[in-house]
Design a protein with these regions (language model features):
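The feature marks the mature, well-folded catalytic cores of soluble enzymes
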Residues: 2-425
Length: 425
């Protein structure tokens, strides 16, 4: 019997043909929330789980037809089946979340049950005065945001970056992702764990929605509420240590901390094709107070840092001449703001010129149609009524009345693991 080889992690762009992707279907963790807990959970509203799952089934169904799909739950069970990996992960979680008295209980659970608890939450034992008076219902809080698999870890080249999240409520996501990359046996990659560097420095944090790979030598980073300048400095230093030869470019876009729809760069800018991108015009192209900074690296060292007019201007100088397509359309700023709020700029490319987005952002879709993109409803593609073959540009649309309430779109909900190389010329 031939031994199964692990998948080599390889992401050199945002648009290369998708070979493998990591997903997590929203489950009971999303429903284990009250309106009072929504803010702590980083939600603007509570979700209707059954509708959210129906919408997510469209995204999952599309991706199952396009690439190999891995799921967080299945991989986590594989990790927990290994006693050494189980002990390491549960130990880290118990120490990080200050619940060491639950260690033995968690270790005794069957793997499938334990995986469920780690994601959906564990109610606290009421057996002391402290626990009786504690207002928190959970010892381990549900991972409300885990269906946004993009944020807790990032694949860059042949490496997985384990992100140090901006909010402690999401720390367990990063621990689980590290365990999956290290201990599931499914992947072959280098690992950069941001928690290993200056662990006491709370000013260091970054999330995957702020990290876009424009080209193998160009990284786009957002600097806002979820990714700090110190986090970017750490990422720059670690990547410099890994890639010690040649010239590399890091382009940093400052972001507003409010409103919450600007939490990540991919909420205002995503790549669609070799020569096209989706932008929220007021921030990316308009006159505003938010800087765009170009960091040039030579042989792993920073040699120049300078301000530039915008992302597109510096990409053009680097040989990527991108035509901007405007989120919400070109004519009405209200439409732009409304559709950006519901992840109208957040696209996931599964091949050059072939993307996935929400169906609700009609003005954005009209703008894409004007630029030659065929609009394909998800179920038409899943059921074989429409094709994405050939050179045509297309956007597959999924329903999105509940999923956007969590604060993200198609790119946020996908963690690409392997893509084909892009022929740039």
């Amino acid at each position: 019997m031939t031994e199964k080889k692990p998948l080599n992690i390889n992401i050199q762009s945002e648009i290369g043909g998708l070979d493998a992707v990591l997903l997590h279907t929203p489950g009971a963790e999303v429903e284990n929330m009250t309106p009072k807990m929504a803010q702590r959970a980083l939600y603007s509203d509570i979700l209707n789980l059954s509708i959210a799952q129906e919408e997510y089934a469209q995204l999952s169904g599309v991706l199952h037809k396009l690439a190999k799909v891995y799921t967080v739950s299945d991989l986590l069970v594989k990790v927990l089946d290994n006693e050494t990996e189980r002990q390491a992960l549960i130990g880290k979680i118990c120490v990080m979340e200050q619940v060491t008295d639950y260690f033995d209980m968690l270790m005794d659970m069957p793997s499938a049950r334990l995986a469920k608890v780690l994601i959906e939450g564990l109610p606290a034992k009421i057996n002391t005065l402290t626990s009786f008076l504690n207002e928190d219902y959970y010892a381990l809080f549900p991972l409300y945001n885990f269906y946004f698999t993009r944020d807790a870890a990032v694949t860059i080249g042949n490496n997985a970056l384990i992100c140090k999240m901006a909010n402690r409520v999401r720390t367990r996501e990063s621990l689980i992702m590290e365990a999956i990359y290290k201990g599931s046996g499914e992947f072959s990659c280098g690992i950069i764990n941001a928690y290993d560097y200056q662990p006491g420095n709370h000013d260091i944090y970054m999330e995957g929605g702020d990290i876009l790979i424009a080209r193998d030598d160009i990284l786009l980073l957002g600097n806002g509420a979820r990714t700090s300048t110190q986090g970017i400095d750490l990422l720059t230093a670690r990547l410099g240590a890994l890639v010690s030869e040649g010239r590399r470019h890091i382009i940093v876009q400052q972001l507003p901390h409010k409103p919450e729809s600007f939490i990540h760069l991919d909420m205002v800018f995503t790549l669609l094709d070799r020569d096209k991108c989706m932008v929220f015009e007021p921030l990316i192209l308009g006159d505003n107070q938010y800087q765009t900074v170009h960091i040039t690296m030579e042989n792993g060292k920073v040699v120049k840092i300078n301000s530039v007019s915008n992302i597109l201007s510096v990409l053009r100088r680097l040989g990527m001449d991108l035509e901007p397509i405007i989120c919400g359309g070109e004519s009405d700023e209200w439409d732009q703001e409304r559709e950006q709020w519901h992840s109208g700029a957040n696209f996931f490319a599964f091949a050059p010129g072939k993307v996935i987005s929400y169906a609700r952002n009609t003005h954005t879709l009209d703008e894409l149609s004007k630029h030659g993109f065929e609009i394909i409803p998800a179920w038409d593609f899943i059921e074989g009524k429409a094709s994405v073959e050939g050179d045509k540009r297309c956007v597959i649309t999924i329903e999105g009345s509940e999923l956007p309430r969590g604060g993200g779109g198609a790119r946020c909900m996908t963690m690409p693991l392997s893509r084909k190389p892009v022929k740039w010329e």
